[in-house]
Amino acid sequence: MSSDQELLTLLNNRISKTTKLIKEKQADALVIFNQANYRFLTNFSGEEAELILTANGDRVLLSDSRFKDQIRHQTPGEMKVVMQTMDVIKEIAGQLKQLDVKTVLVEGEFISATQFEALKQACPDLYFILNAELVETVRNIKDELELETLQRAIDISAQSFKEILPLIEPGVSERAIGAKLDYLFKMNGGDGPSFETIIASGYRGSWAHGVASDKKIQKGELIVIDFGSFYHGYTADITRTVALGQVEPELEKIYYIVLEAQKRGIAAAIAGNTGKDIDQAGRNYIKEQGYGEYFGHGIGHGIGLEVHELCTPAMPYSKEVMKNNMAITVEPGIYLPDRGGVRIEDDVLIKDNHPYVMSQLPKDELLIL
């Protein structure tokens, strides 16, 4: 993004879409606690803030003095900024009383029941409604800046993965490989890992979330590597499974079953299909090959400012309809207890009938190191 004016234009478009949803809820304002959501609407990346957005598009950002200069540099456009000097709920209540609002939506997932009751007691003349996933609904459809930033996060992650492969050898620990990968994210221009890097070798490959441990990698093992770097707030999420030397025939067999299942899932990732359509395209193939019981998780999820976003084909029953410029993962897997596992995951952009794989890393042949 080349200028503050271009950024402001994008932010105003996001605000307009969000205020439309506020009005559809017949509300006057939305109180936002989720860091990803207030960043989406302000460009402020600090971790301590709350945002009030009115149906008219007015914004009130509440933070503290530590972030005063950062807010000034990061947030273009008109916005009231309040440096908190008291309890956050009291501060929010005070600002709401100054606005011409009656019905207020509150992000229910990010406020405790005690805080919600305190807010209602502080503003007895206002009507509060717990609301979930309103800004997330807007975030589902990525704009130009988001796609550019997301692609950069993916490219950094992919390059870092390529650079750790020569380090994988018998006797090296999973933890050492994971630490090096996390280091490379930053050296290649990223902001560090967006989740705890998974390096799961041998029997630990059957653990869907086998984060890097002290286990030493041995010859004849599969290694599941699930990784992603942040870049300017956006995250990649990629998985590759590699082999250290030759592995037993069934482990090699399930690699190619998972690969075909993923290809079928990606092919189904088109506008108009549901999450269930994508999940079933991959899951049914794994079932046909006799491994259905060893694929226990959903086939994917949305990605963006968070590694798991609202747009999610994750569950076999998901009815969410895919739309252009949604970014999702497609990640089938087979996990054989005490023997090993395979997962292959790519980041995919919904583009009409032509899903675009954003994470360009080889996978058509099992990589043997």
What are the language-model segments listed below?
Residues 1-369:
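Active-site neighborhoods and metal-handling regions in enzymes and metal-associated proteins
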